[in-house]
Amino acid sequence: MTDTHSIAQPFEAEVSPANNRQLTVSYASRYPDYSRIPAITLKGQWLEAAGFATGTAVVVKVMEGCIVLTAQPAAAEESELMQSLRQVCKLSARKQKQVQDFIGVITGKQKVA
């Protein structure tokens, strides 16, 4: 019970009990000695609903008695211009100069020779 000087504030749980999952730590066999090592397997449609689609990078934080999995946002796709720039950087110095000259011509900063 609360004492006379405190006010009970209702709160909503951060994680709904309906979203809780229970599992048991199993084991995986390790070659060549076939020793048993602890293993946890997570699978189900709920993973995608929680932001863990196939191919998602995951950061794992481990503490005593607690494991936190955090989905990492997908890296923004590189623009077509940046991809082209990376290709130009791999060219010889002569070809890089030709690309620079071409850019100068189409921007009007350089006259056609």
UniProtKB/Swiss-Prot annotation:
Regions annotated as coiled coil: none
Primary localisation category: cytoplasm
EC number per UniProt: 3.1.-.-
Keyword tRNA-binding: no
GO molecular function: DNA binding; RNA binding; RNA endonuclease activity
TM region positions: none
UniProt key word Ligase: no
Disulfide-bond pairs as recorded: none
UniProt GO BP: RNA metabolic process
Record-annotated SpoVT-AbrB domain positions: 29-74
Compartmental location: Cytoplasm
GO cellular component labels: cytoplasm
Pfam hit, one: SymE_toxin
InterPro entries documented for this protein: SpoVT-AbrB_dom, Toxin_SymE-like, TypeI_TA_SymE
UniProt keyword annotations, A-Z: Cytoplasm, DNA-binding, Endonuclease, Hydrolase, Nuclease, RNA-binding
Enzyme class: hydrolase
Family per similarity comment: Belongs to the SymE family.
Annotated function: Involved in the degradation and recycling of damaged RNA. It is itself a target for degradation by the ATP-dependent protease Lon.
Protein name: Endoribonuclease SymE
Origin organism lineage: Bacteria, Pseudomonadati, Pseudomonadota, Gammaproteobacteria, Enterobacterales
